[in-house]
């Protein structure tokens, strides 16, 4: 008992310091939250503290008494985030020109071109024959024979090759990286027109290089003249928490997220090593991540109208610095009900007026309604038509097969088995359910297929498109979401499993093949449910010097057509097509007297359209556009 008391007394004496107070128990070491769930490392025996070390009276280490086992942050990196005690310091990289390889800058009024980045070059430009990037085809030289119509005052002379001027030397290098050898007809005319500061309304065949037609001259000007100084932001009272605005210099509006993503990728490709930072925003994706991406740079912005309006309302984007406004696929945006958003963006926000900016409109078709809209958006514009507006490419061999609905699957399998080109096959259907159903059917028959439609998430769509472009799934079943504007390389066969309700949609869908001078094939499944498109389809086949089946002529003649000037029909979507002559798809400059509508031109209208003839045109009594569905994320298709 006495021994126990002696041992206890000794233990108490050891825990008493010189001032007579007991030492407090040692607190456990602080563990950062991101390390708390990890398995504890083996306990290390701490080295003996030097004799001079003693805890300070406050219990905190002082510079003179800090244990040598604690990590000291070097002064050179003390400002950086080193992740807490014990973490390894991150040394911030510095670059010769102040920007990482692949990115340039603008300093002291000079364009500082960035260093080359081989990883970025492989990603953006690909390699010869990789299947992801399309080269010009065997019929590319035939583009020189395509008729070109230009109207307006003081039209600049076209260019015949990519040269400086009018193209900036930095852009010329990027054009070579992309293996572009000769400008297409629309580029030959649009490059000098835009470089001359003129507004432009351009109409060209699908796959004719419209995107390069506006990107090349805009980027050349930006490379040459540099960025504009953003206006001074007024203090909104939110302090450090207020949203940081971005001020794009060029704005490209397009109807669908796929198309704006494609334009953005082209912009990245040709803005390589420059000070210009392209950005993209669209509906159906996380808006927070898009806002963070905008903070990394937003000089050339590609956007869908709905998402752009959303970001303007949030105070993230200002249009005060816009010098170039591009409306791509303008007719499609109006068809999808985006006119209110477009008018708000152009007329009601802080975008400079029509006299202070340059406005360009590009599309495969320009009906009269679009040309009327252009009056308020463009000033003294030049009207450019390359080839017959709304026509199909002669590089496409068009076939029309009569097949009842119950036999379509069997004929589709026969076509796939007979396919010898080894290229990509695009199958168009009308509904989202049919896209998934037909894709499942093809997979069950041992065909590698994928699908894309409005109900798939953006991640799923991008994955499907990549699988298709790379050849892992060489068959893509798609709704109208992929019908307009998308540049899918190396499509050799387009199959219209379901025919659209008007010939303009037919033109755009088969235009996914036969691009950039390459040859392609289209096969349309036709039956008596498609007689409303029969007569126009015959005319289109004749124009492109294609074979017209006799059964198609007989079925089309069975349908009675009303109206004057050769008649007209009213399609199931309410579109009315008049007979007679003229540019049926609205391809002439309406400023010229007696232009493309003189002989009973085509007019579009939803609800209450009318059968044609004469020179009548305009919206039907129940017309107007369908309700604005916001962004392209709406499942209108």
Curated annotation (Swiss-Prot):
InterPro entries found in the cross-reference section: DEAD/DEAH_box_helicase_dom, Ded1/Dbp1_DEADc, Helicase_ATP-bd, Helicase_C-like, P-loop_NTPase, RNA-helicase_DEAD-box_CS, RNA_helicase_DEAD_Q_motif
Function (record text): ATP-binding RNA helicase involved in translation initiation. Remodels RNA in response to ADP and ATP concentrations by facilitating disruption, but also formation of RNA duplexes.
Gene: DED1
Chain intervals with Gly residues compositional bias: 561-585
Region (Disordered): 15-68, 560-598
GO annotation, cellular component aspect: cytoplasmic stress granule; nucleus; spliceosomal complex
Compositional bias of kind Polar residues: 15-25
Family affiliation: Belongs to the DEAD box helicase family. DDX3/DED1 subfamily.
Position of sequence motif DEAD box: 328-331
Residues reported to bind ATP: 204-211
Organism: Cryptococcus neoformans var. neoformans serotype D (strain JEC21 / ATCC MYA-565) (Filobasidiella neoformans)
A biological process from GO: regulatory ncRNA-mediated gene silencing
Alphabetic keyword roster: ATP-binding, Cytoplasm, Helicase, Hydrolase, Initiation factor, Nucleotide-binding, Protein biosynthesis, RNA-binding
GO molecular function per UniProt: ATP binding; ATP hydrolysis activity; eukaryotic initiation factor 4G binding; G-quadruplex DNA binding; G-quadruplex RNA binding; mRNA binding; RNA helicase activity; RNA strand annealing activity
Ranges of residues in domain Helicase C-terminal: 395-556
Protein location: Cytoplasm
Keyword Oxidoreductase: no
Domain Helicase ATP-binding: 191-384
Residue numbers covered by motif Q motif: 160-188
Protein known as: ATP-dependent RNA helicase ded1
CDD domains for the chain: DEADc_DDX3_DDX4, SF2_C_DEAD
Domain notes: The Q motif is unique to and characteristic of the DEAD box family of RNA helicases and controls ATP binding and hydrolysis.
PANTHER family for this protein: ATP-DEPENDENT RNA HELICASE DBP3
């Amino acid at each position: 008992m006495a021994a126990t008391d002696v041992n206890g007394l000794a233990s108490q004496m050891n825990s008493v310091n010189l001032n007579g107070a007991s030492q407090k128990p040692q607190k456990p070491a602080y563990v950062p939250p991101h390390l708390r769930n990890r398995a504890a490392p083996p306990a290390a025996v701490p080295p003996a503290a030097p004799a001079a070390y003693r805890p300070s009276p406050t219990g905190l280490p002082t510079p003179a008494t800090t244990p040598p086992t604690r990590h000291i942050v070097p002064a050179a990196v003390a400002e950086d985030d080193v992740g807490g005690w014990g973490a390894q310091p991150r040394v911030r990289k510095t670059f010769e020109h102040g920007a990482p390889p692949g990115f340039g800058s603008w300093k002291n009024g000079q364009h500082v071109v960035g260093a080359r980045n081989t990883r970025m070059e492989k990603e953006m430009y690909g390699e010869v024959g990789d299947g992801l990037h399309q080269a010009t085809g065997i019929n590319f030289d035939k583009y020189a024979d395509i008729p070109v119509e230009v109207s307006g005052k003081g039209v600049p002379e076209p260019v015949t090759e990519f040269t400086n001027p009018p193209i900036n030397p930095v852009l010329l290098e990027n054009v070579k990286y992309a293996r572009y050898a000769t400008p297409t007809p629309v580029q030959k005319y649009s490059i000098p027109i835009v470089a001359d500061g003129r507004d432009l309304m351009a109409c060209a065949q699908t796959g004719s290089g419209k995107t390069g037609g506006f990107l090349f001259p805009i980027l050349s000007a930006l490379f040459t003249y540099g960025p504009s100084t953003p206006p001074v932001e007024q203090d909104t009272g939110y302090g450090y928490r207020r949203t940081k605005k971005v001020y794009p210099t060029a704005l490209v509006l397009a109807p669908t997220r796929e198309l704006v993503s494609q334009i953005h990728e082209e912009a990245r490709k040709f803005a390589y090593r420059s000070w210009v930072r392209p950005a993209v925003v669209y509906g159906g994706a996380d808006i927070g991540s898009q806002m963070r991406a905008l903070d990394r740079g937003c000089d050339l912005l590609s956007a869908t109208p709905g998402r752009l309006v959303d970001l303007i309302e949030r105070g993230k984007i200002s249009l005060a610095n816009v010098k170039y406004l591009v409306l791509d696929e303008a007719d499609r945006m109006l068809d999808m009900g985006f006119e209110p958003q477009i008018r708000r963006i152009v007329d009601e926000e802080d975008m400079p007026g029509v006299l202070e900016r340059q406005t360009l409109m590009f599309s495969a078709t320009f009906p009269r309604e679009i040309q009327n809209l252009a009056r308020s958006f463009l000033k003294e514009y030049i009207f450019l038509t390359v080839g017959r507006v709304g026509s199909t490419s002669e590089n496409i061999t068009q076939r029309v097969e009569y097949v009842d609905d119950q036999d379509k699957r069997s004929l589709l399998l026969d076509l796939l088995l007979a396919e010898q080109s080894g290229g990509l096959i695009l199958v168009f259907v009308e509904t989202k359910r049919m896209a998934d159903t037909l894709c499942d059917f093809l997979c069950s028959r041992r065909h590698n297929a994928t699908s894309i439609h409005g109900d798939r998430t953006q991640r799923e769509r991008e994955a499907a498109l990549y699988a298709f472009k790379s050849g892992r799934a060489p068959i893509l079943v798609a709704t109208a979401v992929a019908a307009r504007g998308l540049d899918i390389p190396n499509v050799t066969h387009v199959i219209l499993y379901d025919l659209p309700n008007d010939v303009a949609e037919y033109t755009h869908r088969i235009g996914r093949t036969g691009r950039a001078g390459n040859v392609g094939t289209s096969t349309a499944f036709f039956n008596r449910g498609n007689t409303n498109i029969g007569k126009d389809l015959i005319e289109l086949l004749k124009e492109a010097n294609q074979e017209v089946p006799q059964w198609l002529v007989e079925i089309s003649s069975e349908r009675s057509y009303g109206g004057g000037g050769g008649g007209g029909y009213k399609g199931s979507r309410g579109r009315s097509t008049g007979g007679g002559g003229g540019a049926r798809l609205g391809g002439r400059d309406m400023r010229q007297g007696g232009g493309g509508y003189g002989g009973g031109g085509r007019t579009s209208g939803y609800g209450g359209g009318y059968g044609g003839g004469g020179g009548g045109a305009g919206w039907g009594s129940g017309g107007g556009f369908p309700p604005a569905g916001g962004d392209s994320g709406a499942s209108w298709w």
